């Protein structure tokens, strides 16, 4: 059967068409802009901690002021004057055969040379620490790159800096997994999932051990001054070990700068995460009623040590965090609580018997 035809519909007038359509202004691109064009992506809002760390990085970036330039120029002029005067004294002592003065000039030259060498060494180590931030930015760019040829050389440089031998099983698995058709993003991602976890696992063990030692020391020791000295020493040692694991050799000023960065990072971004990670679990388990005051203080000190280690790990790590592989305080919290409770139970058992 065929369906009946629908009747015709007559309209009173023509359809209304917008006589003034709104168009955006024409925008032309030159050849250079066309080659560097990248489509905009709608990403999720960055995390609060990332925003805070960006503000912190901007605040920590040194500003080249006029006074600083004047001080540096004065120091350079003073150094040149000292060197020139030393050369003149040496020439006069040689001409007059004043061997005592000549020996003093030689001793002064050795002292100045040692001082200059120390300054150069400290500057090189501090520069190496700053370069790690640039390497992290480069790795972040490679993780969003579709080019080829740079990822493998970059990862091999990171492995060499970390002291990973070519015969290491993780590095061998990475070599076996990459091939010529992969772009830089895939090569760096494979390195981040196959090789980088080896160093991260060692850093996690160092953080866990230092946090546990800090927790037990505070929970057992009755002397607050000893506790403070012990925590400071353990935290500095933890930072040194983490930096060494990631191939960074710290000098005096670079160690102070890293410690300053870690403390500022904790001050800017640590409070909210500490409350978020610890607060709910602390209240739900009613730890204040189960543990003594010293034990609670020990857990707090251990968590702060763990937080310091995590931020030192983040600043020394050559790659950004990928796929939520960043360690959290919750990873160390349960271990610290278990160790404190076990220690308290061992201490009570002999007295009860």
Curated annotation (Swiss-Prot):
Swiss-Prot/TrEMBL keywords: Cell inner membrane, Cell membrane, Membrane, Transmembrane, Transmembrane helix
Keyword Flavoprotein found: no
Transmembrane regions: 70-90, 100-120, 213-233
Protein topology in the membrane: Multi-pass membrane protein
Principal place of residence: membrane
Cellular component, GO annotation: plasma membrane
Assigned protein family: Belongs to the UPF0283 family.
Cross-referenced HAMAP family: UPF0283
Protein name: UPF0283 membrane protein YcjF
